[in-house]
Amino acid sequence: MTEPEVAEFQGLYGPYTVTELLLQKIWGQGLFQQDDLRTCDGRELEILHPGEWNRLGGPDFRRARILLDGKPVSGDVEVHFRQADWRRHGHERDPAYGEVVLHVVLFPPAASEPPARDVRGEALPCFALLDRLHHDLEEYAMDDALSGDLEPRRDRLIERLLALPLKERRERLLGQAWKRWEQKVYFAGLRLKGLDWDDACHHTAMECLGYRGNRGPMLALAARYPLEQLAEERPRPETLVAAVPDTWSRDGLRPANHPVVRLRQYLRWAKKRPDWPERLASEIASWARSGAEPRRPEELLSLAPTFRRDYELPRCHQRLEEFVAAGSVPGSRFTTLVCDGFLPLAAARGEGGLFPYWFYWYPGDAPDVVREIIKTAEITDGRSVSVSNGWIQGVLFSLLDR
């Protein structure tokens, strides 16, 4: 088995790397727009099953099923950064790649570039991911890095933090949280470039309810079933699951996070609050009118003891939970949706002064190792400085070693 290819790109805060393994995950988990797909030469493409991920030698995915111009085709799929990688790796001479029926690449090939060919000399259909991605490639790379094993980085980060005085520790994580916030707002802005406000909110909510393993099928459903349609037709959650078969992951899911359970919650939400994106916009806008002013990140530390009380965060949270979402999504998942979805979207739309809310908002879902780092580095004391979303995000950004 050869080592996966690695490419470097320029991100918002410096270079980042992407491996072919990430591209394979994007393909295998369906983390891209799948409506009205076309191959690079213009043929209609429909993905019935992406194939079984092959981590051994040979093609990256086995036994995929697709439709090309409506005709069923079965075989293997190979994933590369560029179409030229097929020839560079010598696949056109390797019988192990003789059953490949689709070449998936990140970058679309130039019109003058010759197609990849199999061992029989037949041109392979090519599909380019880049223009179909739900997010900026950097966001995929960050999510992938944070979904891996963070334990090896834990001790190194704790050591770096404890080498600083407490005030500098907090300032360091505050600065990292600010960078994380700017990235989230930037990525939300990219989503708003492709979708209007209602659709962007709809896609964001369904993606968040899908967790890491089921973001792809949830986003596919969001594209296929607009919010208005879900509110009016009220399909059964089982019907929605069946609409994108062979794409759901149930490995390691707690019962509360099963796709049917989360879809049932969102359908209840859509039924009770079909206008929830407008409610969200008006509610968050009212916070700015209530007197919150944009503040520089370093000014926030002095607000820690009283921010939640002074800016009525309990009331704000309750309003979002009830006025916007009708109490349909309980627990930390809704809190995560506020921090990862609602607030960045509102900021990207132009609402100012939201970073303090985002930083001092209640903590949502987070890996245990992150909470352990916050505790061991004595960032919070349980009195004047409590655990909040901002401290969690600062640690997460620090773990990326950017």
Say what each PLM segment does.
Residues 104-227:
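Internal, well-ordered alpha/beta segment that forms a basic, Gly-enriched binding/recognition surface
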